[in-house]
């Protein structure tokens, strides 16, 4: 079928070896393995949880008529697990996984609908230190794969929330969000010009495309906003950057305050990892402080997932040998 492929021979061996090396990075950071089912009840990935639109899920029924779904994303499954098996835990829980995910999305022409992801989740920790640990670990995964020319681009969901907090019309908020999600800044400028919103907020949206670059962007953004929520988001990014300097990873990161994610469960910092040779982000992650609560446990968390198939494509196109050195 369209969107799936066989992996065999040398490529299969390389994929297994790459998976093993990246897995070792996660273990070295003190993360423990977790496995969740390939399919779950539909409710685990419902719109209420904030994952993938229902039309993009592979759905089927069991004998009792329950709707089941091939997982499009591992994080909600882990959230369900944590609420069930770690309900009394108060200290940080470090979990890592590898597994296939499935997206039935027609816009993914020429893209795989079944991909292999490797990732990690740090649960029960709402600190900037947790955000930094996850990003530093993501950098180490890239370095261990053999990549050196890459960038982790970091944003903050609350920056956008602060800007739109005073806008009462949900339709306007959704339209602004859609323009920014698609990086359609010309469309955004045209749309904002005709909106009846405060002039200072309008000016930020008109200059949204500029809010992408190195750490100096944070100073520029702070001068542009005057609401507490956006300013707090910028302060959080600064703190994360300072901690990443202690890890020695700051040269691999940049900032994009125009970054949003289609997964609505993200609540704070979000980030994506880019390199040459692949059209999409190889790595995606962020903070989701309310997701596990949907399953019955209040547990602020942060995590990421690497799309192994995309990473292998990038390594091949950059002619990086799969047997790369460790960090």
Task: Identify the residue ranges that each predicted region occupies.
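Short, surface-exposed recognition loops or helix-turn segments adjacent to catalytic cores
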Residues: 149-160, 254-258
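Short low-complexity, flexible loop/linker segments enriched in glycine and/or proline
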Residues: 48-52, 166-168, 269
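Acidic, His- and aromatic-enriched active-site or binding-groove loops in soluble protein domains
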Residues: 56-62, 168-190, 197, 249, ...
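Short, conserved phosphate-binding/catalytic loop or strand-edge motifs used
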Residues: 113-118, 154-162
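Hydrophobic mid-domain F-helix/FG-region of cytochrome P450s
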Residues: 137-144, 158-168
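TRNA-binding/sensing appendages of the translation machinery
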Residues: 1-76, 132, 153
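Positively charged, Gly/Ser-enriched RNA/tRNA-binding surfaces
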Residues: 11-29, 40-43, 75-88, 94-147, ...
């Amino acid at each position: 079928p369209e969107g799936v492929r066989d992996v065999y021979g040398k490529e299969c061996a390389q994929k297994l070896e790459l998976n093993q090396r990246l897995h070792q990075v996660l273990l070295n950071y003190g993360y423990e393995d977790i496995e969740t089912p390939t399919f779950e009840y539909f409710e685990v990935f419902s719109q209420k949880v904030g994952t993938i639109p229902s039309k993009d899920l592979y759905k089927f029924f069991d004998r009792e008529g329950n709707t089941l779904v091939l997982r499009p994303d591992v994080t909600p499954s882990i959230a369900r697990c944590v609420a069930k098996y770690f309900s009394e835990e108060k200290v940080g829980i470090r979990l890592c996984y590898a597994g296939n995910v499935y997206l039935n999305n027609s816009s993914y022409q020429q893209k795989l609908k079944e991909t292999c992801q490797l990732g990690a989740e740090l649960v029960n920790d709402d600190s900037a230190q947790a955000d930094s640990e996850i990003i530093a670990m993501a950098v180490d995964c890239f370095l261990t794969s053999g990549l050196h020319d890459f960038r982790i681009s970091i944003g903050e969901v609350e920056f956008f929330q602060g800007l739109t907090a005073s806008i009462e019309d949900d339709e306007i908020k959704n339209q602004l969000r859609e323009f920014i999600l698609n990086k359609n800044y010309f469309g955004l400028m045209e749309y904002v010009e005709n909106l009846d919103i405060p002039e200072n907020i309008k000016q930020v949206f008109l200059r949204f495309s500029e809010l992408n670059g190195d750490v100096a962007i944070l100073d520029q953004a702070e001068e542009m906003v005057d609401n507490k929520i956006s300013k707090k988001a910028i302060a959080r990014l600064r703190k994360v950057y300072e901690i990443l300097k202690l890890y020695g990873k700051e040269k691999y990161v940049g900032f994009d305050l125009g970054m949003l994610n289609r997964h609505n469960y993200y609540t704070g910092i979000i980030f994506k990892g880019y390199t040459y040779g692949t059209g999409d982000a190889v790595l995606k992650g962020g903070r989701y402080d309310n997701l596990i609560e949907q399953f019955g446990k209040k547990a602020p968390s942060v995590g990421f997932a690497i799309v192994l198939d995309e990473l292998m494509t990038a390594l091949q196109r950059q002619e990086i040998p799969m047997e790369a050195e460790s960090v």
